[in-house]
Design a protein with these regions (language model features):
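Betabetaalpha-Me/HNH-type nuclease active-site subdomain
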Residues: 94-237
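A cross-family structural signal marking well-folded subdomains
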Residues: 1-137
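C-terminal, well-folded lobe of enzymatic/effector domains
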Residues: 56-63, 67-80, 108-116, 216-260
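Generic hydrophobic alpha-helical scaffold/packing signal
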Residues: 46, 62, 66, 163-166, ...
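Noncatalytic linker/hinge segments flanking ATPase motor cores
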Residues: 85-91, 203-207, 243-248
Length: 260
């Protein structure tokens, strides 16, 4: 009965359909578990919930666990050894933030190592994540930086869509006729990275999804644009004021995301 109660209070399969309260570290981990489908952490999360009665310490440990997982996601670290790794945390009775930090610091195997700042920073403009991973990263950054006094309420994870600001089919309507073949390939790679992705509150109409920046931003008489569906998104809305969206802006936004 005790374990069943801990499970009910800790593991929340509907977390992606529920409001994420500021500072609710358990719900943030549940977003990673169910929104980004990293279920291998469940046994360890339950172990900590059972063995660590100090809520403050529990939250600090879970916050560091989130940092660890997010860094590995951003850098596209493998998950193949996660089962063994999280079992080893249980076996070594790791139930405090300091113990978790120290244990991770001693792991040098690339399959479980904590990525350093330089690798994380470079990955924001170098790595193409899956849509569910990119959405999860942006959502958790968005939820972390929002003020409780924000004029718009954070939606549930499932209520957001992910949008490539510069579309994959940029050749149709975006400036690029003067790009060399190599520059065009580099653009193709860059537009898949986090700096070119944003959360929006509703998927864009297919009629403007591949439109140029001005039309995609402002919308048309028949279809709303990013100014409607990305307004209020802390990680993006300021860029709606930009006259251009190009490689330089994508890299600038990536640096801003890293800073969060």
């Amino acid at each position: 009965k005790e374990f069943a109660a801990i499970y009910r209070n800790t593991i929340r399969p509907l977390a992606t359909q529920q409001y994420l309260e500021p500072g609710d570290q358990i719900s943030r981990l549940n977003t990673i578990i169910f929104g980004m489908e990293i279920t291998t952490i469940i046994p360890y999360v339950l172990y900590v919930a059972k063995e660590q009665s100090d809520v403050g310490e529990q939250n600090r440990l879970f916050a560091y666990l989130e940092t660890y997982l997010m860094r590995r996601i951003v850098t596209r670290g493998t998950t193949k050894n996660y089962n063994n790794f999280f079992r080893s945390l249980i076996g070594n009775q790791i139930v405090t933030e300091d113990a978790l930090k120290n244990y991770i610091a001693t792991r040098q195997d690339a399959s479980v190592r904590m990525p350093d700042d330089e690798k994380v920073s470079k990955s924001f403009t170098a790595e193409a994540l899956s849509n569910k991973q990119a959405k999860g990263v942006l959502f958790l950054i968005e939820s972390a930086i929002r003020s409780s006094r924000h004029s718009t309420r954070l939606l549930d994870f499932d209520d957001y869509s992910l949008e490539h600001v510069m579309p994959k089919k940029w050749r149709n309507n975006w400036e690029g006729e003067n790009l060399s073949e190599q520059e065009a390939y580099e653009r193709d790679d860059l537009l898949l990275t986090l700096g070119n992705l944003t959360l929006i509150t509703s998927a864009l109409n297919s009629a403007i999804r591949d439109s140029d920046w001005d039309k995609k931003r402002k919308g048309t008489a028949g279809a709303h644009g990013l100014s409607m569906f990305a307004q209020g998104i802390e990680t993006f809305s300021l860029y709606l004021e930009r006259d251009d969206w190009n490689e330089e802006v994508i890299k600038e936004r990536a640096e801003e995301l890293v800073g969060h």
